[in-house]
C-alpha cells in the first residue's frame, strides 16, 4: 500500500509491504525507519486488537521501500496496519492498490491526524490515486489536494470500508481560515505617527521590508503588529503554498484547513538559528518559512543573535531556505515581508528628550550587530519620534479596512500596469546615487518603493516627488553613526 514520506515539503513515494511466515511470533519494521516509526509496532498491534481483529501469530516483516529513504514520524501507522491486515487476508489485498493512507494509530484503534497530510495527498494525486484514507480531522486538507478523502475515526471503520461494508459520510466543505482582519488590532488605535503609518501603507502595498527605529514607547511594535490587518487575502495558489508549510508542522486548525490570510510570525529575540531559518534532524521549517507570503516581525531587532540575523540575508534575496544535512538537503519557501523594530541605542534614550547615556564603546558594539549589508535589505527605514500629547488625544485616525482598500487598489495597479519612471525622477535618482552612500541594491530598492508610492497615488508615472519620498526612507545616519 502506498503512503509518502516528507523531505522538506516534497512527498517521496513509500511502498509499505507486509510479509507473514511461520515461525516464532515477532514483528519487525525494516527500511530505515526512525524511532517514532519503529514504535509503530506497539501502536499497530494494540490498534488491531482493539478493533476486534485478529493479530497474526506469525513472523511479521514490514518493509518501507525504498530502503535508502529515511522514514520519520508516526504517519505510517495506518498504512502499516492495513498492509498487515491484507497480508493476513482480513481485508482484500486488491483494494489497497487504489488507495493511499496517512494517520497515526492510538492504542485503542482511533486514527489520529498527523502533520503533512496535504503533502501526502498531493503525492497520491500525482501517482494517479484518487482516494486517501486519513483521520477525520485531516479530511479538509486532504481534499485541498484534489483527491477524495476517506475520513475514518477508528481502524475498524477503515477495515469496514476496505471490505465494502461501510462508506464514510462526505466530509463537510472546508472553510478558509479567514477572520484575521477581524481579530487583528486596528490601525485606528495608533495615534499620531503619520510618517510611520504612511510607511506601513507603502510596505503593505509593495511587500517592502520595513524597519521602525526610535525610543521606547513611541509605538513601533504597536504599529508593526497592525500590518497584517491592512494586507489583502492571499491568492488561491499562494494560500496553498502557505497551507502546505503549516500542514507539515501541524499548525492547521481543524475545520479551517486553507490559510487564506497572510501569516504573521513574531519569534522571541532569544530564538535559535534552527527556530528562525529551519533545521533539526528532520529538517523542519523555521519561522522564516512559516511567515512565507506573510509577515515576519523581529521585535527588538538588535537583540537577536548576529548569526541569526545574517542568516536571513539569503531568504530575503532568494525567497527560499536551504537546509543541508548528512542524509540530504531540504528546501523551504521563505518569501516573507520582514518588519523589524529597534531602539537607537542600548539604553533607549537616543532620539528622546532624556538623552542617551551610552558610552561610545557600548554604542559601537550595538551598531556592530547591524551590518550594512543587512540594513541595505530594508526598503523603508523610519525614525519614529515620541508623539506629542496633542497627537495622543486626537481622534479620527483611518481604520485598517480603509487603508486595506487603498493597498489592494495599488497592488492591482502594480500588477496590471506598473508606473514608469519619468525623466525628472530618473535624473534625481542619478544625482542621489552620486551624492548618497547608495549601493546598486539600494538603488533598485528605492526605485521599487517609488513605483509603489506612484501606484498608491493612482499615477501611471513615477514623478520626482514620488522618488524623493522613497529616498527619504533610506537608512538614517543615527543607525550607522555616519
Segments the model singles out, each with a brief description of its role:
Residues 212-256, 318:
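Walker A/P-loop
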Residues 238-274, 279-280, 385, 423, ...:
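Conserved inter-motif catalytic segment of the P-loop NTP-binding fold
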